[in-house]
């Protein structure tokens, strides 16, 4: 008599095993290869100018909404974007908003911004703060035009599920391809265009999740009385809104002090003690004297430098990377680094950008190895 056969169900893979394998394959192998291959210096001449819907710009470090690996092929940086924008005399940018806050440093020229209907004038050397979800647009002075250095944590916002924004007005110089037709949502907002071949191209800031809910946050009112721990969270809802509506939008960096530190001569221009409303970034200017060097240190958080003046090189984990004016230097996580001025006659000036995200999760300290040259 034939025995009855039973098929035993195979056990489900353990979540730990699956996640470990995914982590090893994606982060330890693929991402590691990309990070090792990515350039630490993005040279000005190697980055193309592009006329986009908001401005004419170069993307040194930037998010790619559909492909994180493309981001990492540009530069070994996850949390900081960096773009250089030009506004010709009398021209304006596009008009839009987004959930990630933004920071602009004015390299050349002067002009003004309109943020949520209010005007803010700026000039070379100023730092401009754009709070989360602020509707903003840049206008260049008719005599000078303007060159702006821009950063926004777009990649971080995408990861948190609040990427995107709303495009209210295109830059006057932006042109859709010949024969393309605009695409709009039910409210009439421009979301992209359809090419002659039928392919639809979304605009970078279209398709915002739960926009009405986010806008409502800006109308929050304070509690009359805080009685419980839960009430403190309700009050925080108002405090976040109040900060964004009352913060400093233009920092006059010429009025801020230089500090002679172990790392060198530094001027902090975006910092928790400066009430800009920026919660994502720290930003400082640093000078290196002719033939001198910065201190040598290491920190968990990644960092990006934009060279405003001068020429020199970085030593990053023992490897030399040369740079010059208008180049971007990318310092990945946990990289031991030091900057050197190779010009015996002229000083170096650079702008440093870092995210405070690492501070919030307990990795904001600096391991200092060597003082700057005197």
Model regions and ranges:
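Short, structured motif recognition centered on aromatic/hydrophobic residues
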Residues: 80-87, 103-107, 122, 127-130, ...
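Conserved short histidine dyad/triad with adjacent acidic residue
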Residues: 64-68, 82-97, 265-271, 282-299, ...
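Short amphipathic alpha-helical linker/capping segments at the junctions of internal repeats
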Residues: 119, 127, 167-174, 320, ...
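A short, N-terminal "cap"/entry segment at the start of jelly-roll beta-barrel domains
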Residues: 2-78, 175-279, 365-374
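A short beta-strand-loop-beta hairpin characteristic of the jelly-roll/cupin
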Residues: 92-124, 134, 293, 297-325, ...
């Amino acid at each position: 008599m034939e025995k009855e056969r039973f098929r035993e169900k195979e056990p489900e893979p353990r979540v730990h095993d699956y996640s470990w394998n995914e982590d090893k394959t994606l982060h330890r192998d693929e991402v590691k290869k990309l990070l090792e291959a990515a350039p630490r210096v993005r040279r000005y001449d190697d980055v193309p100018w592009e006329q986009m819907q908001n401005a004419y710009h170069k993307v040194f470090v930037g998010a790619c909404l559909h492909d994180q690996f493309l981001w990492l092929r540009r530069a070994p940086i996850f949390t900081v974007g960096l773009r250089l924008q030009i506004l010709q005399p009398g021209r304006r940018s596009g008009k839009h908003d987004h959930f990630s806050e933004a920071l602009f440093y004015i390299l050349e020229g002067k002009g003004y911004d309109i943020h949520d209907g209010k005007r803010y004038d700026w000039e070379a050397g100023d730092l401009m703060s754009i709070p989360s979800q602020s509707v903003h647009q840049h206008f260049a002075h008719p005599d000078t035009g303007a060159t702006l250095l821009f950063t926004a944590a777009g990649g971080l916002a995408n990861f948190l599920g609040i990427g995107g924004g709303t495009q209210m007005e295109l830059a006057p110089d932006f042109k859709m391809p010949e024969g393309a037709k605009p695409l709009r949502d039910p409210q009439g907002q421009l979301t992209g265009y359809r090419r002659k071949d039928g392919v639809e191209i979304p605009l970078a800031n279209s398709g915002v999740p739960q926009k009405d809910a986010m806008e409502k946050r800006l109308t929050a009112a304070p509690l009359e009385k805080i009685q419980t721990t839960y009430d403190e969270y309700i009050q925080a809802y108002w405090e976040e809104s109040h900060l964004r509506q009352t913060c400093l939008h233009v920092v006059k960096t010429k009025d801020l002090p230089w500090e002679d530190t172990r790392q060198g001569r530094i001027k902090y221009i975006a910092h928790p003690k400066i009430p800009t409303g920026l919660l994502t970034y720290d930003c400082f200017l640093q000078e290196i004297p002719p033939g001198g060097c910065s201190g040598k240190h290491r920190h968990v958080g990644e960092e990006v430098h934009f060279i405003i003046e001068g020429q020199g090189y970085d030593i990053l984990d023992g490897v030399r990377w040369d740079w010059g004016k208008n180049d971007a230097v990318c310092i990945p996580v946990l990289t031991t680094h030091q900057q050197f001025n190779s010009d015996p006659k002229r000083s170096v000036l650079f702008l440093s950008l870092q995210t405070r995200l690492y501070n919030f999760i307990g990795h904001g300290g600096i391991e200092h190895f060597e003082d700057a040259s005197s």
